[in-house]
Structure formats: structure tokens, C-alpha cells
């Protein structure tokens, strides 16, 4: 009884989205496109999680910042074909931040931000914070890839501007709904 009252959304997120094992309709299509063939198992697992998150939360807009092969954004786009999504693949800090600012100003708010592998993750996070709303959520990749990023992730978790956070070891999830108690969860995902 206490679990239903205290943790319904978080419990559902963990049990029905993060730990979900059922094959989704788009997995086969994405595999045919070749995205699953060359990815290591853990990357495929993360991309499928990204698919399930977008499938559940249905953001109207998604911005991905980072350098990659396009597999993550392909999984997320497959979950919501009506979503306005853009990938900013800049290696140039100033140019990428300018593109991000322009896109955020165009959208007026950010529903979902995926901070993938980028050396200027802190600046991307701070820039996007001005555009969050209670339903906004961020996906932060590689939260343990360096000592500096680990330290920064701890700062994000402690930041009063964020609400609930999830540490999935390879990625971090940040939610901004202040109607819920600030809480940090460590989930054994990988």
C-alpha cells in the first residue's frame, strides 16, 4: 500500500520502462537498418532504453547534443515520429552552443535534452536550464566516463533546480518536476 502512495511514478519508471524486456515494434525495423548489428550489447541496451523513455514520455521536442553514429537519435525518433528532433553534432564549442541557443529560443522550452558524448556538457546543461518546464527531462550520457564528469554529475544531483534523478551507471536521467520530493535513485541497469 505505501508503495502505491509514495512511489507510483518512480516505481513504474523503474519496473516498466528501465527494466522492460519485451520486444517493441520498432526494434526489428531498427535492426534491419543495421543499427543493432554493429553495436556492443550494452549500447544496444541503452538505445532501447532511450526508445522506451521517449515512447512513454512522448516529448514534443528533443534536442541531442553530442558526437556519435546516429544510433541513439534513430532509436528515439522511432519511438515518436511526430516529435520535433534535432541533433547538434558540433566539435566546435561556440558554434554548437549558438545552435543550441537558437533551437531553444525557437522552441521556447525544452521537453527532452540528450547530452550525449560532448566535451562541453556543462555548458549545454546550463544553457538548457533556462528553458526547462516541470515536464522537462534530460538524458546525460557517460556520467562516469571521467573523474571530472563524475564530480559534475554529483553537482547535478545536488542542484536545487532539478528534481528527481536516476543514476543508471552509463547514463543519468534528470527530471525537473518540483511537485515531487527531490530524490536520487541508483538503479542497476547495465
PLM feature segments, named:
Residues 1-134, 144-190:
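A short alpha-helical cap/connector motif
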Amino acid at each position: 500500500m505505501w508503495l502505491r502512495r509514495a512511489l507510483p511514478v518512480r516505481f513504474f519508471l523503474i519496473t516498466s520502462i528501465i527494466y522492460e524486456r519485451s520486444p517493441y515494434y520498432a526494434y526489428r525495423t531498427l535492426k534491419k537498418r543495421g543499427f543493432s548489428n554493429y553495436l556492443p550489447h550494452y549500447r544496444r541496451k541503452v538505445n532501447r532504453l532511450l526508445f522506451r523513455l521517449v515512447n512513454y514520455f512522448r516529448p514534443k521536442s528533443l534536442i541531442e547534443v553530442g558526437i556519435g553514429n546516429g544510433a541513439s537519435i534513430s532509436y528515439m525518433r522511432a519511438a515518436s515520429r511526430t516529435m520535433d528532433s534535432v541533433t547538434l553534432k558540433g566539435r566546435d564549442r561556440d558554434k554548437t552552443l549558438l545552435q543550441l541557443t537558437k533551437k531553444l529560443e525557437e522552441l521556447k522550452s525544452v521537453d527532452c535534452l540528450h547530452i550525449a558524448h560532448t566535451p562541453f556538457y556543462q555548458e549545454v546543461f546550463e544553457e538548457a536550464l533556462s528553458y526547462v518546464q516541470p515536464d522537462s527531462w534530460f538524458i546525460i550520457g557517460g556520467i562516469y566516463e571521467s573523474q571530472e564528469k563524475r564530480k559534475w554529475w554529483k553537482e547535478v544531483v545536488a542542484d536545487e533546480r532539478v528534481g528527481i534523478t536516476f543514476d543508471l551507471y552509463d547514463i543519468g536521467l534528470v527530471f525537473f518536476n518540483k511537485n515531487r520530493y527531490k530524490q536520487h535513485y541508483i538503479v542497476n541497469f547495465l
